[in-house]
A protein has these predicted regions:
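Non-catalytic substrate/cofactor recognition surfaces at enzyme active-site rims
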Residues: 1-142
Length: 142
């Protein structure tokens, strides 16, 4: 579903409902993300760069792919929704000085309403994966 930028996030602090799915087809496990998630949230390597607006250690850990159990593990961006770019909160950067010596704010943050979105999507993704794995285990134990 579309999210109206005038209603979602800052400055209105509005909450929206979205969707995250975990699917197993044979040996393939798929996690859908309702936006464009930064690869380091999926694969690891989140940094805490100098100049970030929110000074914190990486929050979106462990990497989501590490919590998947398929032989082939895939993440599909823009799965069922588009809530914006999902940047790690420790890399959130709208105000100078900018990270990585950039002269302007990085591209992604202007398209998401709130820096808390990526930690929420990460945590919910872990919970959805856990439910998938519990369901698969209960089916295999029959």
């Amino acid at each position: 579903g579309a999210v109206h930028p005038g209603v979602y996030g800052l400055p209105f602090n509005t909450k929206i409902r979205s969707e995250i799915d975990a699917i197993r087809i044979g040996d393939i496990e798929i996690l859908t993300t309702p936006g464009e998630i930064f690869p380091e949230i999926i694969n690891g390597g989140i940094e805490t760069p100098k100049g970030a607006d929110i000074v914190t250690e990486p929050v979106e850990v462990p990497p989501l792919r590490q919590s998947m159990t398929g032989v082939i593990n895939m993440n599909f961006n823009l799965g069922m929704d588009e809530v914006g770019y999902l940047a790690p909160i420790s890399q959130w950067d709208r105000k100078p000085p900018y990270t990585y010596d950039y002269q302007e704010a990085p591209y992604g943050e202007i398209y998401v309403g709130n820096p808390e979105v990526s930690p929420l999507v990460h945590q919910t993704s872990l919970e959805v994966l856990q439910r998938l794995h519990q369901t698969l285990a209960s089916i295999q134990n029959r």
